[in-house]
Design a protein with these regions (language model features):
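Hydrophobic alpha-helical segments at protein termini of multi-pass membrane proteins
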Residues: 5-7, 11-399
Length: 399
């Protein structure tokens, strides 16, 4: 099919771009919206069920308000991390909704089955069973349930969205944030009174708002390294290692809570906080690397006439991008601003596809993706043509 257009089936660099034929938009899967509706309705049903069965309705409402406030803060951090190559909003929403519905439902059902299979409840067996359920079974089940979304992201066209470590961290974090949001509502709502609910909220929302996102991040890191491998065994190794790290971290967190305040605070200060600081450092470094990838790919794009030198000047800076979109919107209205945004996104996606090829991961699927991204970029340029023409003399702000 490629040969009929005069292109070789495999290419080495941007020199193949001029023969890619007429532009056409990248295909969009139409199952996303119905799936989002289904998962969203499931989340809503879970919330309604929590309210109807709550022992403390006032505490549940309080939990909803406080958990939502904490969740907004967590999401804001991940959206900041996702600025250089913003992920499709529909997939971000699906990640959060999966965490707050599908993962929660799977965890509840499986943990109930495990709990019912434990031996009879003598005084000693009760304590042992509780520890096994909370510190062993729950981490194993919940991290697997949350991780299913990341495994789904590794399939089909969704794989093209996992370009960098940042992408894996963002999807893992949003899935964990969704799970934590609903779990926090339930735990806070189970307090015997408002004071009890506030105490639980303090422990969960002040000390551990990033707990579940952090656990799932371990698997997200495993997914990223698995995607960098060629062999199946290597991929499986990194996936299992990431999953084991998520389970271990989750188990230590849950187990320490059962062993008294001293143990809990010790694990929190000596184990959780250093790991959290390490992940934050890793995330910021990955975000910085995204900027460098785009900057490195803009130069060849200029050489091959895909972008102009002026465009390359503002495409490599987040503040300059925002200002360019704002200028386009001011001069040409919302349509012009949206068109320039799409052009920016197309350039970024092409840069990441090209980066993977340059790092030696070029195969038929990736070259086909590059073909699609070039065509999408050409279509976006045509749509944004008048706005880009008006930006022809634009220079990014200095500093």
């Amino acid at each position: 099919r490629r040969a009929s257009r005069g292109c070789a089936p495999q290419v080495s660099h941007f020199t193949a771009f001029p023969c890619l034929g007429p532009p056409y938009p990248a295909p969009v899967r139409k199952v996303g919206a119905p799936l989002a509706v289904i998962i969203g309705l499931g989340t809503l049903a879970a919330l309604i069920l929590s309210l109807l069965t709550a022992v403390n309705p006032a505490g549940t409402l309080l939990g909803f308000a406080l958990a939502t406030a904490a969740m907004v803060l967590v999401l804001a951090c991940y959206l900041w991390l996702d600025r250089w190559e913003p992920e499709p909003p529909r997939l971000l929403v699906l990640a959060f909704l999966w965490g707050s519905s599908g993962a929660v439902l799977i965890s509840i059902v499986v943990e109930m089955l495990i709990d019912s299979s434990l031996p009879g409840r003598t005084a000693g067996a009760e304590a042992t069973g509780s520890f096994v359920t909370v510190a062993v079974a729950a981490p194993i089940v919940e991290e697997a349930a949350k991780g299913l979304f990341l495994l789904l992201m590794m399939t089909g066209r969704r794989r093209a969205e996992l370009n960098t470590l940042t992408d894996c961290l963002v999807y893992a974090g949003l899935t964990g944030a969704g799970f934590a949001w609903l779990e926090n509502i339930v735990y806070i709502g189970n307090g015997e009174g408002v004071s009890s609910s506030l105490a639980v909220a303090g422990l969960r929302l002040i000390l551990g708002p990033f707990a579940h996102p952090l656990f799932t991040t371990m698997f997200g890191i495993g997914v990223y390294f698995a995607l960098q491998q060629r062999g199946l065994l290597a991929k499986v190794f990194f996936l299992l290692t990431g999953y084991a790290a998520a389970v271990l971290l989750h188990g230590l967190w849950n187990g320490s809570a059962l062993m008294g305040a001293g143990t809990y605070l010790g694990v929190y200060v000596l184990w959780m906080m250093p790991i959290f600081a390490l992940i934050v450092t890793l995330a910021v470094a990955s975000r910085r690397r995204e900027r460098h990838i785009i900057a490195a790919q803009l130069a060849p794009m200029v050489t091959h006439g895909l972008v102009t030198p002026v465009e390359a000047g503002w495409l490599g800076s987040l503040p300059a991008r925002r200002q360019a979109v704002a200028l386009a919107k001011r001069d040409g209205g919302r349509v012009a601003g949206t068109a320039v945004k799409r052009f920016v996104q197309a350039v970024v996606e092409l840069a990441y596809a090209r980066d993977r090829i340059d790092r030696g991961f070029g195969d038929a699927r990736l070259f086909a993706l590059q073909h699609d991204e070039v065509a999408r970029m050409a279509a976006a340029r045509m749509e944004a043509g008048p706005a880009l023409y008006r930006l022809g003399g634009y220079r990014p702000p200095s500093g």
